[in-house]
Amino acid sequence: PGSRIVLLEQEPALTRFTTLRDYATAGDVTVHEVVAIADQIGIDLDRESATASGGERRRAAIARALAMDPDVLLLDEPTNQLDLSAIEWLEDWLSRYTGAFIAISHDRTFLTRLTKSTIWLDRGGIRRKDIGFGGFDAWTDEVYAQEARNAERLDAKLKLEEHWLLRGVTARRARNEGRKAKLMEMRATRAAMMGPPGTS
């Protein structure tokens, strides 16, 4: 409660603003802070919004978002359409930023340099680990390897239980009925197991 959350959109809506300055200074921002950030990131705020390039629009959006003094920054593809100098400037700013930020990005270098925690949307589920993106590949390999080991163990146990069932259950003893129920449960568990994406 009381935290200021600011979204840096992937495609800022500039159609109702004549200039980048009009856009960047709209809302609850300090104009001199916007101008200072714009100077640092290298954007001419007097450019007309309609003719500004994607990179210029992105820089104006960054100046606006950072000047809002957020507690939490939501970054949607923050390095998209930026040149190397602007990306480096943003990385430097974020490395000194004392608030929190959540980034959705395909820029692996950006994520590796700045992140401390990773959320992985995996086959319909969510996983979280306190590692930066630099450790993501090792983490996924570890998860998939553990899943494969679990599946192998379950397959071996299923094979034994299926063999027991095929030999025939001679009596309706509670023990046998319980074992059959457990077998059905194992079958369902195995059927629900998914391999890594791209496997069947």
Indicate residue ranges for each PLM-predicted region.
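Flexible nucleotide-interacting loop at or near the entrance of a catalytic core
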Residues: 142-200
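ABC ATP-binding cassette signature C-motif
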Residues: 1-151, 200
